[in-house]
Amino acid sequence: MSGLRTLGEFIVEKQADFPHASGDLSSLLASIRLAAKIVNREINAAGLGDITGAVGTENVQGEDQQKLDVYANDKFKAALEARDQVCGVASEEEDEAVAFNKELNQNAKYVVLMDPLDGSSNIDVNVSVGTIFSIYRRVSPIGTPPTEEDFLQPGHKQVAAGYVIYGSSTMLVYTTGNGVNGFTYDPSIGSFCLSHENMMIPEDGKIYSINEGNYIRFPQGVKKYIKYCQENVPEDGRPYTSRYIGSLVADFHRNLLKGGIYLYPSTQSHPQGKLRLLYECNPMAFLIEQAGGLASDGVNRIMDLKPTELHQRVPFFVGSKNMVNKVEEFLELNREED
């Protein structure tokens, strides 16, 4: 037990590397840690209480809100507001950004964007789900309510990002721009403990993750990349293995550990893609680049995109560097056919 480093201890250690740090970001991360524990407890008991299934309402994207979506959203909002380090949040479950109105919150330096429960439709069948978060330093004046500009910042302005995966074990993975570290929740002591230090994704992988049920609607470049993945070329390590869970956090986490690529391209029904730039793609892009991988919309680096609206969608290709480069090649060569 003496060799364990908890998330709290790790954050304090890293803060010591920056003598002029105020500790606000450390406190903010502690709020996320607390909310993750509460949500984890509820997910673990989801089959025993009236917490699964749909609420009967839709979010701004037109998706059915699950009971756990609403629960997780409320818990993360409450935890972030209570610590006074956050002036406002944007969430998949909220039509507009939420400003915290207490004076202490308006004096806060940070805004948080989040998907409180990614993959929540999988809860009823006991498949891994997750929370995704992204932290920015506000651009509006301290002491005033947050503005839309605080949230519509490109991904390269992020100061921290991460996710929590609620699976066979619960893990919190995050970066502040100095590498990626993972912490596994130990329920016996109620703490996240460092289990995966300085996580790096292999430059090549053997896994591709995409919903092939939409194959007929994919751009030609993506169709040809899938065929490339399936070709029998043993000297090149192909065919690759197809693995798709349907939960971004779960698919991303596996590929981060093992090497691979996650693809959610544009389709005929979703020409702008389906994943949200601000609270799904940007945080995952920050993590993957810190781990040695790449994230792209098929043409541009994800973190260079300038957001124009809160719930903006983009095509998303993320994972091992060489695999993302390869799918970009296929998209470029076949763009005129689409």
From Swiss-Prot:
- Residue positions annotated to bind Mg(2+) 2 are 115, 118, 280
What is one term from the GO cellular component aspect held by the record?
cytosol
The cofactor(s) it depends on are: Mg(2+)
What EC identifiers does the entry list?
3.1.3.11
Cross-referenced SUPFAM superfamilies: Carbohydrate phosphatase (SSF56655)
Which parts of the sequence bind Mg(2+) 1?
A: 92, 115, 117
Coiled-coil positions are none
Cofactor comment text: Binds 2 magnesium ions per subunit.
| Pathway listed | Carbohydrate biosynthesis; gluconeogenesis
Gene Ontology biological-process annotations? fructose 1,6-bisphosphate metabolic process; fructose 6-phosphate metabolic process; fructose metabolic process; gluconeogenesis; sucrose biosynthetic process
Q: Which Gene3D superfamilies does the protein's record reference?
A: 3.40.190.80, Fructose-1,6-Bisphosphatase, subunit A, domain 1
Location in the cell: Cytoplasm
Q: Which UniProt keywords apply?
A: Carbohydrate metabolism, Cytoplasm, Hydrolase, Magnesium, Metal-binding
Reactions catalysed, semicolon-separated, are: beta-D-fructose 1,6-bisphosphate + H2O = beta-D-fructose 6-phosphate + phosphate
InterPro entries xrefs: FBPase_C_dom (IPR044015), FBPase_class-1 (IPR000146), FBPase_N (IPR033391), FBPtase (IPR028343), Fructose_bisphosphatase_AS (IPR020548)
* UniProt KW NAD keyword: no
GO MF terms, alphabetically ordered: fructose 1,6-bisphosphate 1-phosphatase activity; magnesium ion binding
Among the Pfam families in the record, one is: FBPase_C
Residue positions binding substrate: 118-121, 211, 244, 262-264, 274
Its quaternary organisation is: Homotetramer.
Q: Which family does it belong to?
A: Belongs to the FBPase class 1 family.
Q: What is this protein called?
A: Fructose-1,6-bisphosphatase class 1
